[in-house]
């Protein structure tokens, strides 16, 4: 029996024609783009080869960490200031994003409302927290309030998108039941949607808080409060033992928050599934 013209001699479909040439072209394009990027960043082979040794030298000079000096400079307070910035920023994002998410969901909001709100979320997410903080510092002045506002604004975009997706994935039975009894739109959101999404949204808020703790440490480098300012100060003076102490304190706090938050989120999701 003759082989089908659409299959190979072993019964499998033949490989698409031109696959090898396309892969070669993509590989060449990737190589060109990498080379172009390295050239644009003024990165040479010597610098690449020397980077691991330089990094190891700095890392080695951080030990033993100068915890006593860091404590005298109030680094512990700065670390917790970063946590406070992240918490207030997350709270701002959570409180403002949830109402907006109801206006952005395709199954509960009309298009003339939904489209602008979704675009607002996109615009907010497109601007990093660092840029937002630089914009806000002339308004609020240097300090943690600028960092908290920057994190809060950026969290609105991310949390709003996540909450919108949660609303669009609900079971619409309770919503239809509220409408059948003559309930208004707000009643449908309160009794038909909110109970379904609240566990998911709460876990999203906690996850965003974990992200914001790390972001708040970076914002301090431009004067927006937190431990980042202390880290920059020690790096400028090349006080590497103090840098090591600051980094280790920050890492311990961040890992602790991540572990506790992950456990709480797991309990919330498991409770919602029962």
Question: Each PLM stretch: what is its role?
Answer:
Residues 1-91, 103, 107, 269-274:
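N-terminal, non-cleaved signal-anchor transmembrane helix
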Residues 76-84, 117, 121-124, 206, ...:
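Alpha-helical membrane-interface segments at transmembrane helix boundaries
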Residues 81, 85, 220, 229, ...:
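Pore-lining and gate-forming transmembrane alpha-helices of multi-pass membrane transport proteins
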Residues 88-121:
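Transmembrane-helix boundary motif in ABC transporter permease subunits
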Residues 121-155:
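Generic hydrophobic transmembrane alpha-helix motif, especially the helices
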Residues 125, 154-157, 251-258:
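Alpha-helical transmembrane segments of multi-pass membrane proteins
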Residues 142-208, 259:
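Membrane-cytosol interface at the C-terminal ends of specific transmembrane alpha-helices
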Residues 203, 244-274:
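C-terminal transmembrane helix and the adjacent membrane-cytosol boundary/short C-terminal tail
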